[in-house]
């Protein structure tokens, strides 16, 4: 999308020890409209796609666009996946989030996002396993079991699906090797989906996600090593 009246959006990332904070100015990104999605050039790409991933941040910009994608995914039997992205999304954008949830086959989030979501739903618990279980059981538009995935940084990854809750270990990494955690959550999601789309078991999806995230946090910015990986999933 090109908006002649606005510059490209900006994001400043501030690194403090092993943590990071982001300051954004969406600018042109905040002007996205469903009409752009419906253009023949863009919609033809939607029709060719076999899976969809929507970040929660997009719900602040164009919820109708996200809903159109979700409805297409449901009608065509394509996976639709969603990331909570930030604690303020379920807090201030609960309505569009809950509208998309019935279409969501895989929901991603970290521990603070999960707890914010639980609070917005009125759950009186901060236990991630219980939150994952309850979210997994919320109404769904098709019969395919929802998968809820909550990461916790250096702690285990929690997955709920089909009434079962499982914890998966992360890849241990010495603190001094952590350079920049920017993009770790997105890296995990990409790694997970790379195996999910190959119909691999969940444990392999989680292992791939944790591996890619582990690689990213050892580098400056959301970047990846050039050499082929040697990790055995």
Describe the residue ranges of each PLM region.
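Conserved post-catalytic alpha-helical subdomain immediately downstream of the catalytic base
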Residues: 140-146, 154, 172-233
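Ribokinase/PfkB-type carbohydrate-kinase core domain
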Residues: 1-167, 171, 222, 226-233
């Amino acid at each position: 999308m090109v908006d002649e009246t606005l510059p490209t959006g900006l994001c400043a990332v501030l690194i403090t020890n092993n943590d990071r904070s982001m300051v954004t100015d969406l600018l042109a990104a905040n002007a996205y409209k469903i009409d752009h999605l419906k253009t023949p050039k863009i919609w033809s790409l939607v029709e060719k796609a076999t899976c969809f991933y929507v970040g929660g941040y997009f719900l602040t910009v164009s919820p109708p666009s996200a809903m159109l994608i979700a409805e297409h995914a449901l009608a065509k039997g394509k996976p639709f996946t969603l990331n909570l992205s930030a604690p303020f999304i379920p807090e201030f954008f609960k309505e569009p989030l809950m509208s998309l949830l019935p279409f969501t086959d895989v929901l991603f989030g970290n521990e603070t996002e999960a707890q914010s979501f639980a609070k917005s739903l009125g759950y009186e618990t901060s236990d991630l396993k219980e939150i994952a279980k309850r979210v997994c059981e919320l109404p769904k538009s098709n019969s395919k079991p929802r998968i809820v995935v909550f990461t916790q940084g250096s702690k285990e990854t929690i997955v709920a699906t089909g009434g079962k809750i499982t914890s998966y270990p992360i890849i241990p990494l010495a603190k001094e090797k952590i350079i920049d955690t920017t993009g770790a959550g997105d890296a995990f999601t990409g790694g997970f989906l790379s195996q999910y789309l190959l119909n691999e078991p969940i444990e392999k999806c989680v292992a791939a996600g944790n591996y890619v995230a582990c690689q990213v946090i050892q580098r400056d910015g959301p970047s990846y090593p050039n050499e082929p990986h040697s990790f055995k999933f």
